[in-house]
Each structure stands twice: as C-alpha cells, then as structure tokens.
Amino acid sequence: MSIRNELLEQILTATAGGGGSSGTNGFIDYNDTSTTSSPVVLNGGVWTSIPNNGLGAFTNKAYSPSGVTELMDTSNGALDLSELALGDTILVRNDYTITPSTNNSLLEFRYTLGAGGGLYTLEKIIGRLDSGSGIGYRRSLLPDLIYMGDTNTLDNPIGLEVRLSASGVLVNAGSAIQVIRQ
C-alpha cells in the first residue's frame, strides 16, 4: 500500500468514515418556492439577499444531524447555526439561476456573518455571464466551507447575497447544508 493510501486509511479510521463522530453528522436540504413565480429583482451593483422559504417539494430533513432540527430561518433564508457547537463545520451547496438583462454581467456571491462591530463577509466572484442576456445561468454544485470558530459566527444569522453588475433576476432552487461535527 502506498504512503498516500495508508494516510487516507488512517484519516478514515480516525474520523469514523470521513467526517467526525459517527452518527452525528448529516444534512438538511432546503428547497425554495418563493422565487419560482416571482423572481428576486437584482439592481445592478447592489447586494441582494437570497430568500428561501423551505417549502419546495425537494426539501429534505430526513438526514439532519443528531440533535439538530433546523439550519435555516425560512422566514428570510438566512442560515441559523445556533444548534451547532464551536468547532463544527458546514458545507453549503447553493443552487440558483440568474438571468441578466445585459450580456457579460459580473456575478458575485457573499455570506454576511457576525453582528454589530463583529460583522464580516466571505465573498467570491462567480464569474462573467457571457453567453447572452435574457437567458438563465444556473449556479450549483460548488460547496462553500464555513467553520464555527467563535460565538460571533455561531450565534448570529448568516445571510446569503448576490450582486450582479447589471440588472437581472434570480430564482432560488435552494441550499443543501452539510454538518461536520468536530
């Protein structure tokens, strides 16, 4: 067995199959319906919150982490990680479609975390939407990692926002949130 395979075996053994304590990890998938018939209007250059009511047919709470009932506030679409513990980590896979009114619009995404003087953001450039205007660009399958390193992150809502350089609309399919316990 190669050194790489031996190391992988040691990691998997130490983490009970690859992710913390056995039986405590899991996920909840929140499927949105609020934007299906009324897409979110995006004004060029303005950060806009992504709603998620969790009422979609594909919402799945059957595999939630042990001791966790919710990971999202479905009244506003913000992540609510107050049932987690310091040291826990989440992977978030967001699935949404942006339809720009102008070709070559720049799309950015961010999480807003913390509160008050401790407010901070995690931002990323998604890219240019350059296949034409008036067509939907679906963004999914790119997970983001957020760890609970302090109570400012753990105890406050985490907002999901997009910014498009031109006007457009957003339809949210939902967010799957995987919990990895310390």
What is each stretch, according to the model?
Residues M1-A16, F27, R181-Q182:
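Short, intrinsically disordered N-terminal pre-domain segments
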Residues G20-A85, T89-Q182:
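Extracellular jelly-roll beta-sandwich "head" domains, especially the C-terminal globular C1q domain
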